[in-house]
């Protein structure tokens, strides 16, 4: 029987890199965002609506139905350990624990300003495509504001999701800092294996590759999920205006750095 674990956390923080590294292990299957979380959410809505027939669905049937979504989606994968990826899984820690009592969630994280900067850098490399990260891409201030929206923002929403999961079930979650993964990949991955309670696999950190052109084309951003060769840290040039840097730096949104589960409140 397959074991199912999860990857969530913040965007532009190494989740694709982490998946690519994990995939070197012949027992592991890890990929970027799957539709399983969305289908799970829709299924939960469907079987808990006011439809009279839903009252005949037992607790065991609900569990079997939802478990079947995972089993069916990954049925063709012959590897014994699956890592499913979604930014929303940290909002469903109680659900995941009930379905997979052993499971854990790996959550890559990074400084918020660095994430915004990374999105701006990568999107600037596709100048002939509309930026799909924000509805209003007239200027960098509007883009960052929309990316940080707590409900729909590509950065703000995952940040709130992560805080929810870490506040309710912190023992299920390992926060994997991007810089640590890049600077000390072996040390970081040994900590990951220890957290997962799996025997360590000797990875080749000089030859890590991954790409998904289909997904990236859907986002109108080339190389959004591309990993090439050696794992190393290359500090990017900051292209954000100083006003934006100061605004989000002063908010101290990186709750994992000061070990406080603070309320995230920002405009």
Q: What are these regions, as identified by a protein language model?
A:
Residues 1-69, 76, 124, 211-215:
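PAPS-dependent sulfotransferase catalytic core
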Residues 14-28, 96-100, 175-200:
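PAPS/PAP-binding and catalytic site of the sulfotransferase fold
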Residues 60-76, 117-195, 249-252:
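PAPS-dependent sulfotransferase catalytic domain
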Residues 69-95:
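Glycine-rich phosphate-binding loop used to anchor ATP phosphates in small-molecule kinases
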Residues 7-9, 82-85, 107-109, 175-177:
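Short beta-strand segments
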Residues 1-5, 159-167, 186-187, 191-267:
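PAPS-dependent sulfotransferases, especially Golgi type II membrane carbohydrate sulfotransferases
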Residues 85-88, 96-122:
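Conserved phosphate-donor/acceptor-positioning beta-strand/loop module used by diverse small-molecule
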Residues 16-19, 38-40, 90-93, 113-118, ...:
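Short catalytic/ligand-binding loop motif for oxyanion handling, primarily in non-cytosolic enzymes
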């Amino acid at each position: 029987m397959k074991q199912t674990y999860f990857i969530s956390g913040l965007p532009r923080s190494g989740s694709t890199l982490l998946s690519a590294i994990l995939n070197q292990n012949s027992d592991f299957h890890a990929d970027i965002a799957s539709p399983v979380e969305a289908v799970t959410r829709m299924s939960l809505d469907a079987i808990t609506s006011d439809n009279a027939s839903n009252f005949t669905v037992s607790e065991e049937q609900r569990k079997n139905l939802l478990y079947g979504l995972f089993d069916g989606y990954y049925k063709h994968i012959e590897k014994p350990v699956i890592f499913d990826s979604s930014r929303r899984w940290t909002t469903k820690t109680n659900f995941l624990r009930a379905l997979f009592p052993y499971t854990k969630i790996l959550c890559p994280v990074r400084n918020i300003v660095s994430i915004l900067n990374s999105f701006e850098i990568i999107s600037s490399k596709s100048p002939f495509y509309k930026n799909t990260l924000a509805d209003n891409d007239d200027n960098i201030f509007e883009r960052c504001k929309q990316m940080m929206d707590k409900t729909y923002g590509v950065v703000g929403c995952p940040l709130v999701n992560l805080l929810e999961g870490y506040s309710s079930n912190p023992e299920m979650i390992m926060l994997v800092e991007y810089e640590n993964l890049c600077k000390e990949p072996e040390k970081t991955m040994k900590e990951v294996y220890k957290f997962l309670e799996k025997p360590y696999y000797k990875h080749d950190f000089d030859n890590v590759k991954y790409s998904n052109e289909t997904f990236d084309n859907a986002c109108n951003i080339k190389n959004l999920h591309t990993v090439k060769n050696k794992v190393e840290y290359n500090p990017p040039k900051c292209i954000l205006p100083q006003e934006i840097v100061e605004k989000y730096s002063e908010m101290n949104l990186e709750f994992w750095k000061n070990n406080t589960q603070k309320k995230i409140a920002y405009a």
